[in-house]
Structures are given as structure tokens and as C-alpha cells.
Design a protein with these regions (language model features):
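Short, small/hydrophobic-residue-rich motifs at membrane-helix boundaries and re-entrant hairpins
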Residues: 19-73, 94-114, 134-138
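Selective recognition of hydrophobic, aromatic-rich stretches within alpha-helical transmembrane segments
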Residues: 42-72, 122-161, 196-198, 203-240
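A cross-kingdom feature marking solvent-exposed beta-strand/loop segments within repeated
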Residues: 74-80
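Interfacial aromatic "cap" segments that immediately flank transmembrane helices
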Residues: 2-31, 81-104, 143-194
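Short, tandemly repeated low-complexity microdomains enriched for cysteine and small residues
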Residues: 109, 193-194, 198
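Juxtamembrane helix-boundary/capping and inter-helix hinge elements in multi-pass membrane proteins
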Residues: 72-74, 173-174
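Low-complexity, intrinsically disordered extramembrane tails and loops of integral membrane proteins
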Residues: 1, 237-246
């Protein structure tokens, strides 16, 4: 598929089941709302924290299910209400990937800040080091976006989510336009869907607009971006299988 076909197919997939969109919207709204509730009572705070984590696991598990069904050729969004335990289990692995990459990227950023506070920013070695660290940070960020998909196409083995060389090869085989679009959509999707649940989002809007984003926009972005990334990787994987068979 070319870029236009990928966009068209992803949009059709997203709008194919409006009931699922509503359910996903409710899930994301609950998750982002609970995260912003400030509770002083210790017991209630723990309960809300556990509930927030469960909703995050379900959201990430649903994302994993979209990836899985797309790779298997299914053209309908998966049922959010079917097998919630399975979604939580899948979500747990997705969160491990999230935490793993977040830790690496945070470590690189911390190292750059440490160097900035403890050395001259005009020193040539410092400039070279920060440039290299920035490149590494960018590489890990873009690899994180398709890491769950690479795990899915390799028998769901978690180690494949962290094989940087394989992930970069997938981007290379997508083609420049598809790769750039995948990166932009992936970053946008993460910031508008996952980040608000974790309270990491860069958006600082009024509550009404936050509600609209969580309930109306986030479900669309979740399904569209995940479908687009999955289809892009699926096409690469299918071509490799065809080449091997030929």
C-alpha cells in the first residue's frame, strides 16, 4: 500500500464500529479523569491508583489486540468487552515496553542535563556528546513507537520489542513517506491517548476541551494510529515472507 491507501484503510477501520469507539472513549475518559482526581485519604488514594493502573493496562491491552488482529488480517476493531483478563495481561507487557523505553530516554536526558550543569556548553567535546545523546534519544523514541508491533510479529516475544536494529530496519523498509507519517502519527497518538492517562501530556487545556479530547478525539486517534502503524509493519513483514517463499 502507498501512503494514501494506508491512510484511507486506517480511517475506514477506525469508523467501522461506532459502538467500539464510544466504549473506548468512555475507557479513556475514565482513565484520564481518575488520574486528575486529588485524594488525601490514603485508602481511597490507593484504590484510585489501582483503578487507574487497571484502566491503563486495559487501554494498552486493547492497543495490543488491534495490532494482533491487524497482523492476522482482521478488518474489524476488536471487542473491548471480550476477555478483559486477556487485555490486562497483554497490557502488562505493553507497559513493560513503555517503562523500558521511558527509562532509557529519561536516562539519556538526565545525562545531558548533568553534562550541561557540570561542564561548559561551548566545549567542543560537550557539543559532540550532547549531539550524539540527542541522536540516541531520538532513535529510542521512534523505535518505541513500533516496538509492540515487532513483538507481535515475532511470536509475542518481549525481547523483540527492544531489538533496535530490527526496528530501524522496519522503518527503512516502510519507505520514507510511510516511515515519517508513522513517526508523526505515533508521537501524536501517544501524547493524546497514553500521556494524559499518565499525566505526561503536553496539553494544558480547559477541562471541557480535555473531556472532548478524551471522549471524542482520543478513541479515533488510538484506533487510527495503531491500525496505520500495524498495517505499515504488516506490509513489510508480508513482503519478507513472500520473498522467502519465492
Amino acid at each position: 500500500m502507498n501512503l494514501k491507501e494506508l491512510m484511507k484503510e486506517s480511517l475506514k477501520y477506525t469508523l467501522r464500529d461506532w459502538k467500539m469507539l464510544i466504549l473506548v472513549g468512555i475507557l479513556l475518559t475514565l482513565a484520564s479523569t481518575i488520574e486528575e482526581i486529588h485524594i488525601t485519604h490514603e485508602t481511597l488514594a490507593i484504590i484510585f491508583l489501582i483503578l487507574s493502573l487497571l484502566l491503563l493496562l486495559i487501554e494498552e491491552g486493547y492497543r495490543a489486540k488491534i495490532i494482533e488482529t491487524t497482523l492476522h488480517g482482521n478488518n474489524m476493531p476488536p471487542n473491548l468487552l471480550k476477555n478483559p483478563k486477556g487485555l490486562i495481561k497483554e497490557g502488562f507487557y505493553e507497559v513493560i515496553i513503555l517503562v523500558g523505553y521511558s527509562s532509557i530516554i529519561s536516562g539519556i536526558i538526565y545525562l545531558m542535563l548533568y553534562m550541561g550543569f557540570n561542564g561548559s556548553i561551548y566545549n567542543l567535546n560537550f557539543i559532540i556528546a550532547v549531539t550524539l545523546l540527542s541522536i540516541f534519544c531520538t532513535i529510542f523514541l521512534i523505535c518505541f513507537l513500533i516496538a509492540p508491533i515487532n513483538k507481535a510479529i515475532n511470536d509475542d516475544k518481549l525481547i523483540h520489542a527492544f531489538k533496535i536494529h530490527d526496528l530501524l530496519k522496519l522503518y527503512h523498509k516502510m519507505g520514507l513517506s510511510n516511515a515519517i507519517c508513522s513517526i508523526i502519527l505515533g508521537i501524536t497518538g501517544f501524547n493524546l491517548v497514553v500521556a494524559p492517562i499518565l499525566n505526561w501530556g503536553i496539553l494544558d487545556t480547559y477541562k471541557f476541551f480535555e473531556f472532548l479530547i478524551s471522549f471524542l478525539l482520543s478513541p479515533l486517534i488510538l484506533l487510527f494510529t495503531t491500525r496505520f502503524l500495524s498495517l505499515s509493519v504488516k506490509e513489510v513483514a508480508d513482503k519478507e515472507i513472500k520473498t522467502i517463499n519465492d
